[in-house]
Amino acid sequence: MTNLLSGRISLATAGLLMMLSGLVSAQVLNESDLLLQPTDLLNTSTQGAGNGAYIQQLGNENELQLFQQQEGLEGNLARVLQSGQWNIAIITQTDQGNKLALIQKGSNNYYELTGTGAENELVNIQNGSDNRIVQQFLNSSQISSELVQVGNSNEIVQILENIQGQNFTVRQIGDGMKVIIKQTGQ
């Protein structure tokens, strides 16, 4: 009887672990997520969950630096996939309801985020090689940003300082394009 009981507990524990691993793997970005609308990448809620980070680097020599700090009741979320090689992502998110979903599928792509402030939601997709995105949100609030680059050698620089309630969507499809967005509020 003892063996049967311990066998049942082991099966129940194994089932629970499989269920939990399924939940975590559903959070990780995959290359097939490139087919989704960019805002669909943020549908994972952070309600009551605090910080979260789901990272998948499939290629060689990809680098990720991620810092998230939670100071409120709900948290930051980051979902990162770097599929090619030699991609670099440097992500800093601080308090409140920040989210980020980043896909860099090609090679030699660079992404950097310095974020502070309130209700930030970001989606960044770089599908190509030698692309660069730099975002700085200084003392900002309620920012929703979607930046998509499909092609090679493209660059987006977005600097927002003391901005209240912004919503950006920039899509570059092609090669060798550059956009600089700099806004300063009071």
Enumerate the predicted regions with their spans.
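Low-complexity repeat regions of mature extracellularly deployed or surface/particle-associated proteins
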Residues: 27-186
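Bacterial N-terminal signal peptides that target proteins for export
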Residues: 2-12
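A short glycine/proline-enriched turn/edge-strand or helix-cap micro-motif
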Residues: 1, 25
